[in-house]
Amino acid sequence: MCLLGVSAPTVASYDASAPMSTASNGDVDIAYRVVGDPQAEPILIIMGLSASHRVWNPQLITGLAEGGYRVVLLDNRDVGESSKIEKKGRLWLAWQLLKYRIGLRVKSPYALSDMAVDAVAVLDALEIERAHVIGASMGGMIGQIVAYDFPQRTQSLVSIMSTTWAPHLPQPGRAQQDGISEMNESSEEQAADLQKLGFYPSALPNQVTAILSAGDRTARVAQISAPTLVLHGADDQLLSVEHGEHTAQTIKDAQFKVYENMGHNLPDPIIPQMVNDMLAHLRANPI
């Protein structure tokens, strides 16, 4: 595969079914796998709400690995093969969402900052001092926290379809909120089918409230010093393009790119260009 006009050696294809390794953050075990040359510069890549690492587009993972990088994928706590935390019920999430809408404090079993420490624990397990960090949606929020809480571990940042959660930004549409509620109300059979696709409805109460309880992180995001690339879809109905624009405006010297025909997802047609954009950013900021 040749990207950006630079040839790279062929690496093993991304196999999401291969056995995973485990890192520990206290009592929490975080499952991870590595794709690509073990001697190459590392990329830590973090997926979003209720989704395991298997949700990443294989073409994107393989493209980054064949571009000359060691790609480290993890399952956030509560999804995939990582530890499952105290399970909260559907009614509990509905109550927390109602409190958020009327301006009351939202409670969560853990914080996004805890999930950032989980990610750093994976770097520790692999004895990686510095890494490029890529995150999508909630994973982008976690990546931002890694960048501002652990600047010494962050070589560069790519924040995809994510947000600072500033209060002036458009809230998710009713259809998108209803979609999250419907997933939260999945039957056991529906949940099993979703898990086959890499989604874990059981994680929603804990992770949604982790996002909401974090609130506006604009002041902290402004502290990010790592070179940053912000990517967003023009058609994103969950986190509108204004969220990506504000993230890029908040981080000094951040680059911002919008993809047409991309919503809150990673559609196949845009992956080759996205990989090229990521590789250009990574190569401009080597470890």
Regions found by a protein language model. Give the residues of each.
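Conserved HGGG/HGGXW glycine-rich cap/lid loop of the alpha/beta-hydrolase fold
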Residues: 28-98
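Conserved acidic catalytic loop of the alpha/beta-hydrolase fold
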Residues: 101, 109, 113-131
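Conserved alpha/beta-hydrolase "nucleophile elbow" surrounding the catalytic nucleophile
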Residues: 131, 135-137, 233
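Flexible "cap/lid" loop of the alpha/beta hydrolase fold
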Residues: 141-148, 157-184
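Active-site nucleophile elbow and catalytic-triad environment of alpha/beta-hydrolase enzymes
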Residues: 204-220
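Short beta-strand/loop motif that positions the catalytic acidic residue
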Residues: 224, 230-232
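Conserved alpha/beta-hydrolase "acid-adjacent" motif
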Residues: 237-243
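Catalytic active-site module of serine/aspartate enzymes centered on a nucleophile-bearing elbow/loop
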Residues: 254-287
